[in-house]
């Protein structure tokens, strides 16, 4: 068979397919309602094949969570790496967070609204993701303003905390009623024009 044959899938492509199928199941039926056989059946695979990639459902869940976190971190990092004023860039990072929520609702749900948030490893992973996002923003703030690193970290934590809280409310109550472009969630960034 040739390398381009549709019947042969690379190990990485299969791993991605398993992660995507698992993400859909974990979001729709929760961690406890999802079995490895559900993921395997979705892809037309045997359960032992899924276990070749992930040793347990918990390992699979953490891998999906890791992918969600990387997606969020990349989204924020991209927003922070554009040109413009400090205020514009931090506003763009807030907007990027809301775009992540809107575009990647399943990843958002896994990170912030999952039945596994009480799992120690999952909670630590989400905390690490958010800590990294805060660090990205704080680094940008401290290099673009006269704020010392500790104050930049505090301000970045405030921006991320406010964005996370507002996003939860937006998702639960007003997501389809409010035009996101009209939400001035990033007004606290006015403080950054110091």
Question: Which positions does each model-derived feature cover?
Answer:
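Short, hydrophobic secondary-structure boundary micro-motifs
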Residues: 109-112, 149, 179
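Amphipathic alpha-helical packing segments from all-alpha helical-bundle domains
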Residues: 70-73, 120-145, 153-158
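Amphipathic alpha-helical segments used for helix-helix packing
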Residues: 100-121, 138, 165-172
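Hydrophobic alpha-helical connector segments
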Residues: 63, 77-103, 155-159
């Amino acid at each position: 068979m040739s390398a381009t044959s549709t019947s042969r899938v690379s190990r990485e492509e299969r791993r991605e397919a398993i992660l995507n199928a698992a993400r859909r199941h974990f979001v729709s039926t929760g961690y406890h309602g999802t079995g490895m056989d559900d993921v395997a059946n979705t892809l037309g695979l045997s359960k032992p094949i899924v276990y070749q990639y992930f040793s347990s459902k918990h390992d699979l869940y953490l891998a999906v969570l890791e992918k969600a976190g990387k997606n969020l971190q990349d989204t924020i990092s991209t927003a922070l790496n554009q040109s413009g004023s400090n205020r514009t860039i931090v506003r763009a990072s807030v907007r990027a967070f809301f775009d992540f929520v809107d575009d990647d609702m399943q990843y958002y749900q896994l990170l912030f609204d999952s039945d596994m948030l009480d799992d120690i490893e999952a909670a630590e992973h989400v905390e690490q993701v958010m800590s990294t996002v805060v660090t990205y923003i704080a680094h940008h703030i401290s290099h673009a303003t006269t704020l010392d690193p500790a104050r930049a970290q505090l301000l970045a934590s405030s921006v991320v905390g406010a964005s996370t809280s507002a996003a939860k409310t937006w998702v639960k109550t007003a997501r389809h009623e409010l035009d996101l472009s009209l939400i001035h969630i990033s007004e606290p960034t006015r403080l950054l024009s110091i």
